[in-house]
Curated annotation (Swiss-Prot):
Protein purpose: Cell wall formation. Catalyzes the addition of glutamate to the nucleotide precursor UDP-N-acetylmuramoyl-L-alanine (UMA).
Record GO terms (molecular function): ATP binding; UDP-N-acetylmuramoylalanine-D-glutamate ligase activity
GO biological process: cell division; cell wall organization; peptidoglycan biosynthetic process; regulation of cell shape
InterPro entries: Mur-like_cat_sf, Mur_ligase_C, Mur_ligase_C_dom_sf, Mur_ligase_cen, MurD
Associated pathway: Cell wall biogenesis; peptidoglycan biosynthesis
Annotated catalysed reactions: UDP-N-acetyl-alpha-D-muramoyl-L-alanine + D-glutamate + ATP = UDP-N-acetyl-alpha-D-muramoyl-L-alanyl-D-glutamate + ADP + phosphate + H(+)
Pfam family, one: Mur_ligase_C
Domain of life: Bacteria
NCBIfam families linked: murD
Enzyme class name: ligase
SUPFAM superfamilies associated with the record: MurCD N-terminal domain, MurD-like peptide ligases, catalytic domain, MurD-like peptide ligases, peptide-binding domain
Entry EC no(s): 6.3.2.9
Protein name according to UniProt: UDP-N-acetylmuramoylalanine--D-glutamate ligase
Length: 447
């Protein structure tokens, strides 16, 4: 007889998928959410009318019976209900851990502060081109447990994993794992760079091969590579044998593996040095998982990039407009400024601002001084950004993103690019970064 009682912590998309997974496996469960009006509550009650739901508080007599807590990654590990369950002896883990315990197909695991979604999508496309039945999931698209129904159809999983998901995962043994880069983000949750890096490093546990960024010390495996683990690196410099990088020859830059030139960067559609790094990482991961170089390079030549990630909108009166609304932290915005600024003659007019998540905006000073003409600020933390950068370049304030577009048009000169890369989260003014990007794109199309 099964006496286990599961607590699903957190509703929303992930919580719903966990509940469906438990129901398919005939497990008894209850649900908790910290919010009085939890997202997806009506949908949940419609689908699971007999399952008890506790909002904001869970009684001690329930906690004392719980054997396992499967929590959504959005719930901080020090949430009181999780602390009480831990003290009562319950195991606490997330949906990725459930997946790891269920599947036998190989996994490519991808994390990093920036570029995760681009690399994950690219690797998925490479696998599809090579004929793999591939599941692309995790911190992108469909929750993993909603895809488990079809597990026998997949011969490869490509997972984008956030630091929050990795905090809750113990058994994943990827065929290859990578940390693309680590820059300050989510410090409101992890508190220190050390804790944030430690969460990212969990992706390497049990991996058969690891791919790291040789220009970012935080991505280098903390456990030195053992003899049975293959270590591969990528970077902007010329690579050593078996590694990935860029080679300059006769005024042309090539993606390369060792001394082998694979493709001139002009042949790929995703632009900017940061996207060349994403392309190299995707190549390395795909090859490590057994995908042929022919399929890898064919996809690279046709992949258009993802919406809201350094996405070209249009040119107006000689000025280019680029939507990088996914630039929700300083590292992403630095990558965008350096990547775009380093490949053009003019200057950048930067639109930035929103919720800064405790970041230090002084880190923007160097790339801003080199490539940016002026900054138009919006949002909650505009004061903090202005105090960090007002001595570097002219700073103007706008009360809305539509207003910022109008101001940026007057600041830019022919040959310039207006770049929306906020270095901040969007929730002070928008539903999410997609909404912010859509508002920007719509405003630019209306110029």
């Amino acid at each position: 007889m099964n006496h286990s009682l599961y607590l699903v912590a957190g509703l929303g998309k992930t919580g719903l998928s966990i509940a469906r997974y438990l129901k398919r496996n005939n497990k008894s469960f209850v649900v908790f959410d910290t919010r009085k009006e939890a997202p997806g509550l009506a949908e949940f009650q419609n689908e699971f009318p007999d399952v008890p739901i506790y909002l904001q508080q869970t009684p001690d007599e329930v906690i004392s019976q719980v054997t396992d807590v499967i929590t959504s990654p959005g719930l901080a590990l020090d949430t009181p209900v999780l602390e009480r369950a831990r003290q009562a002896g319950a195991s606490i883990y997330g949906d990725i851990e459930c997946l790891a315990r269920e599947i036998s197909a190989p996994v490519i695991a991808i994390t990093g502060t920036n570029g995760k979604s681009t690399v994950t999508t690219l690797v998925g496309e490479m696998a599809k081109a090579a004929g793999f039945r591939v599941a692309v999931a995790g911190n992108i698209g469909t929750p993993v447990l909603d895809m488990l129904d079809d597990e026998h159809h997949y011969d490869l999983w490509v997972l984008e994993l956030s630091s929050f998901q990795l905090d809750l995962t113990y058994s994943l043994s990827p065929v290859v794992a990578t940390i693309l880069n680590v820059t300050p983000d989510h410090l409101d949750r992890h508190h220190t760079m050390e804790a944030y890096t430690q969460a990212k490093q969990r992706i390497y546990r049990g991996a058969k091969a690891v791919l790291f960024n040789r220009e970012d010390v935080y991505t280098v495996p903390h456990q030195s590579c053992q003899t049975d683990i293959k270590c591969i690196s990528f970077g902007k410099d010329a690579p050593s044998m078996g590694n990935w990088g860029l080679i300059e020859q006769e005024n042309t830059t090539y993606l390369a593996k060792g001394m082998e030139r694979l493709l001139p960067v002009e042949s790929i559609l995703i632009k900017g040095v940061h996207n060349w790094m994403n392309a190299l990482a995707a190549c390395a991961l795909a090859e490590a998982a057994g995908i042929s170089m022919q399929h890898i390079l064919n996809v690279l030549k046709t992949f258009p990039g993802l919406p809201h990630r350094c996405q070209w909108v249009r040119e107006v009166d000689g000025v280019g407009w680029i939507n990088d609304s996914k630039g929700t932290n300083i590292g992403a915005t630095i990558s965008a400024i350096n990547g775009i600024g380093g490949s053009m003659q003019g200057k950048i007019v930067l639109i930035a601002g929103g919720q800064g998540k405790g970041a230090d905006f002084q880190e923007l000073a160097q790339p801003v001084s080199e490539f940016v003409r002026s900054i138009v600020l919006i949002g909650e933390d505009a004061d903090k950004i202005e105090s960090a950068l007002a001595k570097v370049v002219p700073v103007v304030r706008a009360s809305s993103l539509e207003g910022a577009v109008t101001i940026a048009k007057t600041c830019a000169k022919p040959g310039d690019v207006v770049l929306l890369s906020p270095a901040c989260a969007s929730l002070d003014m928008f539903r999410d970064f997609n909404h912010r990007g859509d508002v920007f794109t719509s405003s630019v199309r209306g110029l």
